[in-house]
């Protein structure tokens, strides 16, 4: 009996790391997938219903060196040998990762075991792990065309960023949205956006008067979300069919995580982007700039954005269907619908080459 091909997927933390990895896994139904994550992160909720999950206690280095830095470094070193043992015991054939600090022990352990590593970097400016360890990977697939120049010593290939299958098929939206109103979708990403939420609520009356219906995904950490109500305004902590929402939306107001931007591109949704100001190396700002340069989005820095500016930007776009149509078309040029298949093909080719 032929042994199944076993792939270790190292992806942890936010939806931006997890959803592209899940999209890859969906394209490898004949592979045995084992997931590597971190305790108490989003993957402990999303992954176990589909794939066996192994966890290691790693975290990224933050701030100035301290006693905690030593502990983090020790845990990373221990994790390398934990993952190496996992690779050997499970007879893993290859490792795929979407970056973040969990990628480091996975890449090093794979090199120690002499098995291929496939890395997907979704941000325009590569993260530290990509920059440091990308040269150890067989392929570094990138989400933005311009990223290759930051990785001169890596075997890069542009494939866009994989999205979940539902984003590639028409979805029905089970929400009470009047057919004669423009739809604005506001989403703060998996980490929420309380400051932006407050500004959006002050804009709602003007946008509704201009003919809009607003679906506002507030996240779970917004204390004012339960106290605000308005006609043609729906507030939800979370909605599990973002594909349907964005396919229906005339305009999105969003953070600028790479995964979110790819979903906006695939659904051809014009956007107002407010990059998360505390993202590592300000990567969301650089991601958003690509969409601005392409004519697919407007961008505002959170620290200088006022509610009045946001309100006017929304009104200007609502009152210009031609501009929205141009932005939608531009967004569609920034992603590839077949990204997940391309990444799966890279994995398959790497495994075949190594056997």
Curated annotation (Swiss-Prot):
Compartments it resides in: Cell inner membrane
Keywords: Cell cycle, Cell division, Cell inner membrane, Cell membrane, Cell shape, Cell wall biogenesis/degradation, Glycosyltransferase, Membrane, Peptidoglycan synthesis, Transferase
Catalytic activity: di-trans,octa-cis-undecaprenyl diphospho-N-acetyl-alpha-D-muramoyl-L-alanyl-D-glutamyl-meso-2,6-diaminopimeloyl-D-alanyl-D-alanine + UDP-N-acetyl-alpha-D-glucosamine = di-trans,octa-cis-undecaprenyl diphospho-[N-acetyl-alpha-D-glucosaminyl-(1->4)]-N-acetyl-alpha-D-muramoyl-L-alanyl-D-glutamyl-meso-2,6-diaminopimeloyl-D-alanyl-D-alanine + UDP + H(+)
Signal peptide: none
Bilayer-spanning residue ranges: none
Main location: membrane
GO cellular component term of the entry, any: plasma membrane
Top EC category: transferase
Membrane topology: Peripheral membrane protein
Listed Pfam families: Glyco_tran_28_C (PF04101), Glyco_transf_28 (PF03033)
InterPro entries the record matches: GlcNAc_MurG, Glyco_trans_28_C, GlycoTrans_28_N
Chain sites annotated for binding UDP-N-acetyl-alpha-D-glucosamine: 14-16, 123, 164, 190, 284
GO biological process: carbohydrate metabolic process; cell division; cell wall organization; lipid glycosylation; peptidoglycan biosynthetic process; regulation of cell shape
Gene3D superfamilies referenced in this protein's UniProt entry, alphabetically: Glycogen Phosphorylase B
Pathway the protein contributes to: Cell wall biogenesis; peptidoglycan biosynthesis
EC number: 2.4.1.227
GO molecular function annotation: glycosyltransferase activity; UDP-N-acetyl-D-glucosamine:N-acetylmuramoyl-L-alanyl-D-glutamyl-meso-2,6-diaminopimelyl-D-alanyl-D-alanine-diphosphoundecaprenol 4-beta-N-acetylglucosaminlytransferase activity; undecaprenyldiphospho-muramoylpentapeptide beta-N-acetylglucosaminyltransferase activity
Protein family membership: Belongs to the glycosyltransferase 28 family. MurG subfamily.
Reported function: Cell wall formation. Catalyzes the transfer of a GlcNAc subunit on undecaprenyl-pyrophosphoryl-MurNAc-pentapeptide (lipid intermediate I) to form undecaprenyl-pyrophosphoryl-MurNAc-(pentapeptide)GlcNAc (lipid intermediate II).
HAMAP family associated with the record: MurG (MF_00033)
Protein name in UniProt: UDP-N-acetylglucosamine--N-acetylmuramyl-(pentapeptide) pyrophosphoryl-undecaprenol N-acetylglucosamine transferase
Gene: murG
């Amino acid at each position: 009996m032929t042994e199944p091909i076993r792939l270790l997927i190292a992806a942890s933390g936010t939806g931006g790391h997890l959803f592209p990895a899940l999209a890859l896994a969906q394209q490898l139904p004949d592979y045995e997938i084992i997931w590597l994550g971190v305790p108490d992160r989003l993957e402990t909720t999303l992954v176990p219903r589909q794939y066996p999950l192994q966890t290691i206690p790693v975290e990224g280095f933050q701030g100035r060196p301290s006693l905690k830095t030593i502990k983090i470094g020790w845990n990373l070193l221990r994790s390398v040998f934990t993952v190496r043992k996992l690779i050997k015991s499970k007879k893993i054939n290859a490792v795929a990762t979407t970056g973040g600090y969990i990628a480091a022990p996975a890449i090093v352990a794979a090199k120690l075991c002499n098995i291929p590593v496939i890395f997907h970097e979704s941000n325009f400016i590569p993260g530290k792990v990509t920059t440091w360890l990308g040269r150890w990977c067989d392929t570094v697939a990138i989400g933005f065309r311009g990223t290759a120049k930051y990785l001169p010593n890596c075997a890069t290939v542009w494939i866009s960023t994989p999205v979940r299958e539902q984003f590639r098929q028409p979805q029905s939206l089970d929400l009470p949205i009047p057919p004669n109103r423009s739809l604005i979708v506001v989403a703060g990403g998996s980490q929420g956006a309380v400051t932006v939420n407050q500004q959006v609520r002050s804009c709602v009356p003007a946008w509704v008067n201009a003919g809009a219906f607003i679906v506002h995904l507030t996240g779970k950490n917004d204390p004012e979300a339960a106290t605000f109500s308005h006609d043609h305004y729906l507030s939800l902590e979370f909605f599990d069919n973002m594909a349907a929402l964005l396919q229906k939306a005339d305009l999105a107001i969003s953070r600028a995580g790479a995964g979110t931007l790819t979903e906006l591109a695939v659904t051809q949704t014009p956007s107002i982007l407010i990059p998360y100001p505390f993202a590592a190396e300000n990567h969301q700002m650089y991601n958003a700039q690509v969409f601005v340069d392409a004519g697919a989005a407007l961008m505002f820095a959170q620290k200088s954005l006022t509610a009045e500016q946001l309100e006017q930007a929304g009104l200007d776009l609502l009152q210009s269907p031609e501009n929205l149509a141009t932005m939608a078309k531009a967004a569609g040029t920034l992603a590839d619908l077949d990204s997940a298949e391309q990444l799966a093909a890279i994995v398959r080719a790497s495994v075949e080459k190594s056997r």
